[in-house]
From Swiss-Prot:
This is Transcription initiation factor IIB. SUPFAM superfamilies: Cyclin-like, Zinc beta-ribbon. Sequence repeats lie at residues 124-207, 218-299. It comes from Sulfurisphaera tokodaii (strain DSM 16993 / JCM 10545 / NBRC 100140 / 7). Gene3D superfamilies: 1.10.472.170, Cyclin-like (1.10.472.10). Transmembrane segments: none annotated. CDD domains: CYCLIN_TFIIB_archaea_like_rpt1, CYCLIN_TFIIB_archaea_like_rpt2. Pfam families: TFIIB, Zn_Ribbon_TF. Stabilizes TBP binding to an archaeal box-A promoter. Also responsible for recruiting RNA polymerase II to the pre-initiation complex (DNA-TBP-TFIIB). The keyword Disulfide bond does not apply. Keywords: Repeat, Transcription, Transcription regulation. One of its GO terms (cellular component) is transcription preinitiation complex. PROSITE patterns: TFIIB.
Length: 308
């Protein structure tokens, strides 16, 4: 090939479907011109081949992603509890006792320091509360990350693990705009509400965490769904909240209480009546709160309730 032809071949880009990788030489070659596009390329893929998803999973030697809700983030190994060998055969009693001893030592090795023990207990508590509240994994991961930062800052020292975990969950819910009240979270832990609230304020201050202002509308869908209300009733409740915002009635008010009152009004107007007690229990507020917000909204927005 002449020099002019060579320069012309180099100037013309090789079509993507004509580029092949020579594994032996580590080169990307254009089959159309024979030009070496890249040499000494590193193959980032595995050295093994698999033809089914099962084979791929079996031959892979890497673990899953880091898990914030496990005290060691899931990077340590765990001895299986199935009491079976590599061939799937059940272990004999003598071997089973030996493996049991290995397990005990392996657990002790995983949880050696006081911080490890603290995190192990805290992550179990976090998982328990998260499951009871039906929180998504993203919120639990955020709560675990907040708790780990609190441990690093020494905020847990002198405080109960339960109260700091509950406060971390509440902070995560606020950050992720997940409609959960402090009372709702506190009822699933041994710590009292006042202690959880104190830890929550401490976490925000010391970790410099910014949380958005709670919007009453975020609570409407969840409360309405648990009450079995129709979409039109929930939409009406959101409209009532919007009008209340425009009139300046939401400032300084508990968002859950406002949402509960708006739902109560919308349910009455749409003939899907629910009692104040029923709505208050679902919303995690008192009947008095629902009653007071109801009076404010109906009077200030001039809402006429039939048969009232």
């Amino acid at each position: 090939m002449s020099e002019s032809n060579k320069s012309q071949a180099s100037a013309t880009p090789c079509p993507p479907d004509k580029i092949v990788f020579d594994e032996e030489r580590g080169e990307y070659i254009c089959t159309e011109t024979g030009e070496v596009i890249e040499e000494r390329a590193i193959d980032q893929g595995p050295e093994w081949r698999a033809f089914t998803p099962e084979e791929k999973e079996k031959r892979s030697r890497v673990g899953g992603p880091l898990n914030q809700t496990i005290h060691d983030m899931g990077i340590s190994t765990v001895i299986d509890w199935k009491d079976k060998d590599a061939m799937g055969r059940t272990l004999d009693p003598k071997r089973r006792l030996e493996v049991l001893r290995w397990r005990k030592w392996q657990i002790r090795a995983r949880i050696q320091s006081s911080i490890d023990r603290n995190l192990a207990q805290a992550m179990n508590e976090l998982e328990r509360i998260g499951n009871l509240l039906n929180l998504p994994k993203a919120v639990k991961d955020e709560a675990a990350l907040i708790y780990r930062k609190a441990v690093e800052k020494g905020l847990v020292r002198g405080r109960s693990i339960e109260s700091v975990v509950a406060a971390s969950i509440y902070a995560a819910c606020r950050r992720m705009k997940m409609a959960r009240t402090l009372d709702e979270i506190a009822q699933f832990t041994k710590a009292n509400r006042k202690e959880v609230a104190r830890c929550y304020r401490l976490i925000l201050r010391e970790l410099d965490i910014n949380v958005p202002v709670s919007d009453p509308k975020d609570y409407v869908t969840r409360i309405g769904s648990l009450l079995g209300l129709s979409g039109s009733t929930m939409k009406m409740a959101i409209d009532i909240i919007e009008k209340a915002k425009e009139s300046g009635l939401t400032a300084g008010k508990d968002p859950a209480g406002l949402a509960a009152a708006a739902i109560y009004i919308a349910a009455l107007l749409n003939d899907e009546r629910r009692t104040q007690k029923e709505i208050a229990q679902i919303a995690g507020v008192t009947e008095v709160t629902v009653r007071n917000r109801y009076k404010e909204l109906t009077q200030e927005l001039k809402i006429q309730i039939p048969n009232q």
